[in-house]
A protein has these predicted regions:
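NAD(P)-dependent Rossmann-like dehydrogenase/reductase catalytic/cofactor-binding core
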Residues: 2-132
Length: 132
């Protein structure tokens, strides 16, 4: 799913009228064209050793801490923004949508970033804002 979402990000980058050539595919960055290769590569990176998913202790064990920045920023801002950009350029991003739906199914609807809150209502508004 990560690689599929990364492919969708790369498709978005190619569609936008900005120089986004520096946005590398994860597969290129980690030199890993498959999920298996990516898993092996990432699990072997020393800097990632000891990193855990945010959890909180409950009776009988641990559960994900959906109030941590990891979840609130990455989903409610990062993924939501990418999906909104895809809507502006009419690109289907089913893997991003599936991931966001999974998150919503777990935590319910939450306040999320919306371009319209900042006066960005159209594709042209988006381009103008980021061309400043």
């Amino acid at each position: 799913l990560l690689i599929a979402c990364d492919t969708e990000v790369q498709q978005l980058c190619k569609t936008l009228p900005f120089n986004l050539s520096y946005v590398k595919s994860l597969c290129v960055h980690y030199e890993s064209p498959t999920a298996e290769a990516m898993t092996k590569k990432i699990s072997g990176i020393t800097g990632f050793k000891g990193l855990t998913s945010p959890t909180k202790k409950v009776e009988g064990g641990y559960i994900p801490d959906f109030n941590s920045r990891y979840f609130t920023a990455d989903f409610s801002y990062g993924l939501v923004i990418l999906i909104q950009i895809a809507e502006y350029v009419n690109i289907d991003v089913p893997n991003m949508r599936e991931t966001l739906q999974w998150y919503h199914d777990l935590v319910g609807e939450r306040k999320e970033y919306n371009f319209k809150d900042y006066g960005i209502n159209t594709y042209q508004d988006f381009v103008d804002f980021y061309s400043l």
